[in-house]
Amino acid sequence: MAIVYNRVKSTNDLELKDRLVAINRVTKVTKGGRTFTFAAIVVVGNEDGVIGWGLGKAGEVPAAIAKGVEAAKKNLIRVPVHNGTIPHEQAASYGGASVFLKPATTGTGVKAGGAMRAVLDSVGVTDVLAKSKGSSNPHNLVKATIQALAEMRSPLMVAQNRGISVEKVFKG
């Protein structure tokens, strides 16, 4: 079955908040000396089920962050969030980074670290258990986490795909 991501078409009515995940300074050595540029990975979300990520590169940090925010606004998806948690367990990997997300009861909080926490906070998840294995590269962790969130399906979506009622999804 092909995965259809829930793309967000318009950002006009969304109040997006941006979070800086990581900044990387890159040095290019030339005959005339060293040239420094900066790469910033940024996550934007409305804390209500919409998330996007972007990478910006520039000669100055603020310009790199601004470019990352603009790139993230062009790359938004909608994620089903119910009662502050995700609907089901989900695993995903990107490059050498593997992530595993598991729903949690109310009051648990976001049990995730680093780049995964920024993504989950931006999407509006308040209770989730998360584990990352393999690479801790923030670029790959962000992409793997967003891939896992993009593969989430709400019970209503599962019921519509199967042609059954929502009650049958839970009770078999």
UniProtKB/Swiss-Prot annotation:
Domain S5 DRBM: 16-79
Originating species: Porphyromonas gingivalis (strain ATCC BAA-308 / W83)
Protein name: Small ribosomal subunit protein uS5
InterPro entries for this protein: Ribosomal_Su5_D2-typ_SF, Ribosomal_uS5, Ribosomal_uS5_bac-type, Ribosomal_uS5_C, Ribosomal_uS5_N, Ribosomal_uS5_N_CS, Ribsml_uS5_D2-typ_fold_subgr
GO biological process: translation
PROSITE patterns noted in UniProt: RIBOSOMAL_S5, S5_DSRBD
Gene for this chain: rpsE
PANTHER family in the record: MITOCHONDRIAL RIBOSOMAL PROTEIN S5
Subunit structure: Part of the 30S ribosomal subunit. Contacts proteins S4 and S8.
Source species, domain of life: Bacteria
Lineage: Bacteria, Pseudomonadati, Bacteroidota, Bacteroidia, Bacteroidales
Protein's job: With S4 and S12 plays an important role in translational accuracy. Located at the back of the 30S subunit body where it stabilizes the conformation of the head with respect to the body.
An example Gene Ontology molecular-function term: rRNA binding
Ribosomal protein listed as a keyword: yes
UniProt similarity note: Belongs to the universal ribosomal protein uS5 family.
Keywords: Ribonucleoprotein, Ribosomal protein, RNA-binding, rRNA-binding
Domain remark from Swiss-Prot or TrEMBL: The N-terminal domain interacts with the head of the 30S subunit; the C-terminal domain interacts with the body and contacts protein S4. The interaction surface between S4 and S5 is involved in control of translational fidelity.
GO cellular component: small ribosomal subunit
